[in-house]
Amino acid sequence: MSANRLGSWSALAMSLLGVAYFVTLTIAVSVHGITAPIVDPILAVMEVLTLISAPLMVVVISAIHAYASADRKIYGLIALAFVSVFAAMTSAVHFVELTAVRQRGSSGMIWPSPAYAVELLAWNLFLGLALLFAAPVFAGSGPERGVRRGLLISGALCVAGIVGPAVGNMRLQLVGVFGYAVVLPVVCLLLARLFRSDRNHVSRPAA
């Protein structure tokens, strides 16, 4: 399977997972409200979706790195490093939550808690940085411009969300949620279309 084909399928899968996560989150907010903690079974569904999306996001960024021209591969490499940290952190948090924490008879991440802080660091800072560094890979016009702008917006919103836990106001963190739960699935759909339309793309040499 070519890098573009792999990128297309993984980006499409990320978009669909994002829709599923957003729908689940909407249900959670309608049931529990914005301030109340989300509990099982809705929380368990969200954690499983997160565990699936973490390695998929690594595949998406890897495909972006493969797509980059030679003089822009450094951006793809930096993005890949940041997304790998993100995936490891969030996977560890949710694996522990789904196994050890529940076997102790408890569940849920309520702020402030160490596990929740690690989770927000992963999704806000490290995912946000990965998206921001992935954006310069797409230097062209047309579809590439749309992907570049989407990555910049999503990444900036994710990073901005770190202000919430930093100041202890979790309503401010909703900016980050909008970045990765709403904007990112749209960007992944644009990525899937770009990779699909450019199956014969070969990494270009530096100008």
Segments predicted by a language model, with ranges:
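Hydrophobic, aromatic-enriched alpha-helical segments typical of multi-pass transmembrane helices
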Residues: 1-207
